[in-house]
Regions:
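Divalent-metal-activated hydrolytic enzyme cores
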Residues: 38-42, 64-105, 130-131, 140-149, ...
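Short glycine-enriched loops at secondary-structure junctions
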Residues: 114-119, 139-142, 168, 180
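Boundary at the C-terminal end of the N-terminal hydrophobic targeting segment
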Residues: 58-63
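Catalytic core of membrane glycerolipid acyltransferases/transacylases, capturing the structured
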Residues: 119-136
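Conserved functional hotspot residues or short segments at active or partner-binding sites
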Residues: 165
């Protein structure tokens, strides 16, 4: 079940070669860990802000059980600010170690319902690494019964504390719904899910995209007793967001 959902995000991280011996590398990692701990105790883990930009600093692994829904959302938004500013840190982590740590289990602190658009690489957009984001993707970021079931699994079985429904600039699914053109195959099956947003916002594409994200977020809260129950118990936050593919920035809509 832990592989119920494949994020379909291809993260390419270049790794530089090193001639350092195994013993020297181990010592370096231990020393680096001590330095990070000292930085954390001094309050440096949140990062430095210089000239309005968040400077990339090493971050510790997230302790899911210690995060509140608000803190989980703040972590995602802080990651997006790093990404938009060109200071991403997720790819600096030891990916081999992360793969090993998540081999038998996953404990993502967040979930994102995103469009299938290739220009919206969710983990990169929020500067998160392996095992931190439970991602459901479908054209138009719509809350179908299958998507709701997947997100319920994230909440009930994995303990995610925040769900972000992420619309994005120039969404083709919303544009196609506005135009109402006949499409081959089952593409037009998306339209009924997006039509309420178009009816609400009119032909303005950007307005319809934002309305759609908010409507789908509301649907998650209303259609799922698992999700609504977690929200009522203050264990979960469900919000809508808008990703500008030009700037790289995410704006919360609620």
């Amino acid at each position: 079940m832990t592989s119920l959902l494949d994020s379909r995000v291809s993260t390419r991280c270049s790794q530089s070669s090193s001639a350092t011996s195994g013993a020297e590398m181990c010592a370096w990692k231990q020393d680096s860990s001590r330095r990070r701990f000292i930085q954390l105790t001094m309050g440096a883990a949140a990062g430095l802000v210089t000239g309005g930009l968040e400077v990339a600093t090493p971050r510790p692994a997230l302790a899911q059980s210690k995060l509140s829904p608000d803190a989980a959302l703040q972590e995602l938004m802080a990651g997006n600010r790093r990404f938009a500013a060109g200071h991403s840190t997720a790819c600096e982590k030891d990916l081999a170690t992360l793969r090993k740590a998540t081999e038998e289990k996953q404990e993502p602190f967040s979930a994102v319902l995103a469009c299938a658009d290739s220009r919206v690489p969710v983990e990169l957009v929020f500067d998160q690494s392996i095992g931190q984001v439970f991602v459901a993707r479908i054209a138009g970021n719509i809350a179908t019964s299958e998507i709701i079931a997947s997100l319920e699994y994230g909440v009930a079985a994995l303990g995610t504390q925040v769900i972000v429904v992420l619309g994005h600039r120039n969404c083709g699914a919303v544009k196609a719904t506005i135009e109402g053109k006949g499409e081959p195959g089952q593409i037009s099956a998306l339209y009924p899910h997006i039509r309420p947003a178009v009816d609400q916002a009119g032909p303005n594409l950007d307005a319809a995209i934002k309305a759609n994200a908010k409507i789908q977020a509301a649907l998650l809260r209303q259609a799922s007793t698992v999700i609504s129950g977690a929200v009522k118990e203050s264990k979960l936050k469900v919000v809508a967001g808008y990703y500008d593919i030009a700037s790289g920035s995410v704006t919360l809509l609620e």
